[in-house]
């Protein structure tokens, strides 16, 4: 591994200082594609939670979660602007491209963070607000500032930040947390490593160049393929827990098992390939499928709730 691959120091001179960007540039700071998945998983958390919630309160909660996720994205782009400037995939982001200054992004993200948390607390409840605040803190401080440039386990631990939205949604309805939202959290938490390591396999050169110790850079591609397979084997049983715990029914269990078989097949395809074009193709295939996979799993929970099909046929006697 090269010296650049173990550096964890920020180089704030690596990108140009621009002026006030357009509304589109500031919207891009929010990482809207990431935000859309966050909103959807939070919506499922709201939908499957017991009890009712006024539609206006539900909308407010989703808005706060979306703004909080966007704020996290803006603060992440502020802190990571130096490495974004040196990666082909991120070089055209607003800060490295000089359309928005780092200071503007930091102020923008901070204001949105405070707005999201305070609005959630005042208009929804303070349990959901506390979880939202912790999520923003975890993503910015624990993942972005501490783990990302220091350890190949950055995705494993830092992935918790992306797993909180359904728990926040649940808390917005109930004012508490329980085993059900924790299971939804666990699904996303276990999904994150194989999802991002698949990306890292065919982008490892970019990560090595900027000193981010992703698993392929530190431990090699063979170990990364092995870890993807192991985490995939752990993920599939976790996705079946909603049925065994009684808040998902036969539709969810059957479809999720089939989706899981597809995930395992693609993970196995990565595991048995050698470095090169075939590995990159297999990794891209799993990366793309993993996004659809998570979306469909949470969609199944939502559909069962809407159709009144969620049942206890598979529930364990706990």
From Swiss-Prot:
It is an enzyme of class 2 (transferase). GO terms for molecular function: protoheme IX farnesyltransferase activity. It catalyses: heme b + (2E,6E)-farnesyl diphosphate + H2O = Fe(II)-heme o + diphosphate. Signal peptide: none annotated. One of its GO terms (biological process) is heme O biosynthetic process. Keywords: Cell inner membrane, Cell membrane, Heme biosynthesis, Membrane, Transferase, Transmembrane, Transmembrane helix. It is a multi-pass membrane protein. Its EC number is 2.5.1.141. InterPro entries: Protohaem_IX_farnesylTrfase, UbiA_prenyltransferase, UbiA_prenylTrfase_CS, UbiA_sf. This is Protoheme IX farnesyltransferase. It comes from Parvibaculum lavamentivorans (strain DS-1 / DSM 13023 / NCIMB 13966). The lineage of its organism: Bacteria, Pseudomonadati, Pseudomonadota, Alphaproteobacteria, Hyphomicrobiales. The gene is ctaB.
């Amino acid at each position: 591994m090269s010296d650049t691959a173990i550096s964890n120091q920020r180089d704030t001179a690596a990108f140009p200082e621009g002026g006030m960007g357009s509304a589109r540039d500031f919207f891009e700071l929010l990482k809207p594609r990431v935000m859309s998945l966050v909103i959807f998983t939070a919506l499922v958390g709201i939908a499957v939670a017991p009890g009712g919630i006024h539609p206006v309160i539900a909308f407010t909660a989703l808005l706060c979660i979306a703004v909080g996720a966007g704020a996290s994205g803006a603060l992440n782009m502020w802190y990571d602007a130096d490495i974004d400037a040196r990666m082909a995939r991120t070089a055209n982001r607003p800060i490295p491209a000089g359309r928005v200054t780092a200071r503007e992004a930091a102020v923008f993200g901070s204001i949105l963070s405070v707005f999201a948390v305070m609005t959630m607390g005042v208009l929804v409840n303070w349990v959901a607000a506390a979880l939202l605040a912790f999520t923003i803190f975890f993503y910015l401080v624990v993942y972005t500032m501490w783990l990302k440039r220091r350890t190949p386990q950055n995705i494993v631990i830092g992935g918790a930040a992306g797993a909180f939205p359904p728990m926040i949604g649940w808390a917005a309805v109930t004012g508490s947390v329980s085993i059900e939202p924790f299971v939804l959290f666990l699904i996303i938490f276990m999904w994150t490593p194989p999802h991002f390591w698949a990306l890292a396999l065919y982008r490892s050169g970019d990560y090595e160049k900027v000193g981010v110790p992703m698993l392929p850079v530190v431990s090699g591609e063979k170990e990364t393929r092995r870890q993807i397979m192991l985490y995939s084997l752990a993920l599939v049983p976790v996705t079946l827990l909603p049925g065994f715990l009684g808040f998902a029914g036969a539709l969810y269990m059957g479809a999720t098992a089939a989706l899981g078989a597809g995930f395992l097949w693609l993970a196995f395809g990565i595991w048995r390939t050698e470095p090169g074009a075939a590995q990159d193709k297999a990794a891209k295939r799993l990366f793309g499928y993993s996004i659809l996979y998570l979306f469909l799993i949470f969609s199944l929970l939502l559909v069962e709730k809407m159709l009144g099909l969620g049942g206890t046929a598979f529930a364990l006697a706990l």
